């Protein structure tokens, strides 16, 4: 469908295991429009942090180059925690970032909107580095509008909250509530 983008998210260092082909092999076979790289471990249920500099830097840069060569139409996204992650994403040739919004979400949910300045700095830095911006983690009906109002967010990832909200409002009404926030 037009306007629908297929994104595969995972750890690029994940090797084949049982029926799993390995992350890089999977994305090269499927060729999604977007590939989001997260530093999760194999047994991790959900992301709890983004990438930062480390001993994996050169290997990660090589994997990004390989993925760009093998899947020419795929954009490569790097899951990051903070402003330091923006420069890192640019240096290793990612096309976009996904801001880990766990800290943002927790702050907003606790009534502390001072976090908005930090998120705005990340957005501004990403724009200065010509990176597109996605965001996700713990976003919900209460905190999403703050992020949307900042502008320049290309895409948001909302997971668990949709299911929880669906128990209260029903699935269709929940989706309409999220779309209303995003569109307004």
Predicted features and spans:
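Catalytic cores of alpha/beta
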Residues: 15-29, 82-92, 135, 139-153
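C-terminal helical cap(s) of enzyme catalytic domains, especially alpha/beta-barrels
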Residues: 47-49, 111-112, 164-184
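Hydrophobic faces of well-ordered beta-strands that scaffold small-molecule active sites
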Residues: 4-10, 33-37, 74-78, 97-99, ...
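Glycine/small-residue-rich loop that forms an oxyanion/phosphate-binding "nest" at active or ligand-binding sites
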Residues: 1-54
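Surface-exposed amphipathic alpha-helices with a cationic face
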Residues: 1, 61-71, 90, 120-130, ...
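Histidine/lysine/aspartate-rich catalytic loop segments that bind and position anionic ligands
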Residues: 42-43, 54, 73-125
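Active-site-proximal loop/turn and secondary-structure-junction residues that shape catalytic pockets
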Residues: 10-14, 31, 39-43, 80-84, ...
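Glycine-rich phosphate-binding active-site loops on the catalytic face of alpha/beta enzymes
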Residues: 35-43, 96-108, 151-171
């Amino acid at each position: 469908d037009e306007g629908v983008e297929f994104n595969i998210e995972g750890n690029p260092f994940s090797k084949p295991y049982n029926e799993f082909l390995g992350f890089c092999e999977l994305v090269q076979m499927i060729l999604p429009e977007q590939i989001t790289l997260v530093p999760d471990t194999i047994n991790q249920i959900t992301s709890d942090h983004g990438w930062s500099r480390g001993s994996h830097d050169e290997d990660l840069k090589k994997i990004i180059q390989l993925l760009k060569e093998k899947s020419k139409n795929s954009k490569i996204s790097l899951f990051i925690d903070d402003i330091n992650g923006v420069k890192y994403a640019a240096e290793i040739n990612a096309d976009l970032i996904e801001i880990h919004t766990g800290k943002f979400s927790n702050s907003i949910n606790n009534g502390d909107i001072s976090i908005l300045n930090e998120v705005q700095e990340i957005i501004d830095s990403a724009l200065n580095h010509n990176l597109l911006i996605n965001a996700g983690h713990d976003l919900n009906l209460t905190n999403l509008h703050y992020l949307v109002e900042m502008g320049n967010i290309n895409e948001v990832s909302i997971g668990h909250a949709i299911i929880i909200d669906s128990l209260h409002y029903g699935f269709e009404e929940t989706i309409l509530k999220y779309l209303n926030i995003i569109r307004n």
